[in-house]
A protein has these predicted regions:
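Short acidic/glycine-enriched loop/turn segments that link adjacent beta-strands
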Residues: 39-43, 65-67, 98-102
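Conserved beta-strand in the GNAT
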Residues: 55-58, 115
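Vicinal oxygen chelate
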Residues: 1-3, 88-127
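Mid-chain, well-packed structural core segment of small domains
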Residues: 67-85
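Core segments of cupin and vicinal oxygen chelate
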Residues: 10-52
Length: 127
């Protein structure tokens, strides 16, 4: 089984779009990339990290325990890993669909959120 990191998702306060772009884009030099149309309402700002990883900065109010902070793992077979998690007593759950990127979320034993996905083609082009 092949597993690697696809993105890191971190919170940012409402109204911080300029500061987010200034720090990650201007200061750190990360190129901004468009988020899929299906999640634009979430006011996320995405940056490219290296060749195939991403940083997702999402608006969260208030910043606190009920967070959507998570990391994403690319897996060969989304259905297989979902079945394994279900069989082990975990509760995978679905979120907004991104075309070309089947995915689901699940909490680890400590409550951390993990996104599991497969990348099918160039999902940023499949809008």
């Amino acid at each position: 089984m092949s597993v690697h990191l696809q993105h890191v998702s971190i919170p940012r306060p409402p109204g911080s779009e300029d500061k987010t772009r200034a720090f990650y884009g201007d200061l750190l030099g990360l190129p901004e990339i468009p988020a899929p149309n299906s999640i634009q309402a979430a006011e996320v700002i995405w940056f490219r990290l290296g060749e195939d990883a991403e940083l997702h900065c999402f608006r969260e109010k208030p910043l606190g325990d009920a967070s959507n902070r998570h990391f994403c793992l690319v897996v060969d077979d989304v259905a297989d890993i979902r079945q394994k998690l279900n069989a082990a007593g975990y509760a995978p759950y679905d979120v907004e669909v991104i075309p070309g990127r089947p995915r689901f979320f699940c909490r680890d034993p400590f409550g951390n959120i993990i996104e599991f996905t497969s990348i099918v083609g160039d999902y940023l082009e499949l809008q």
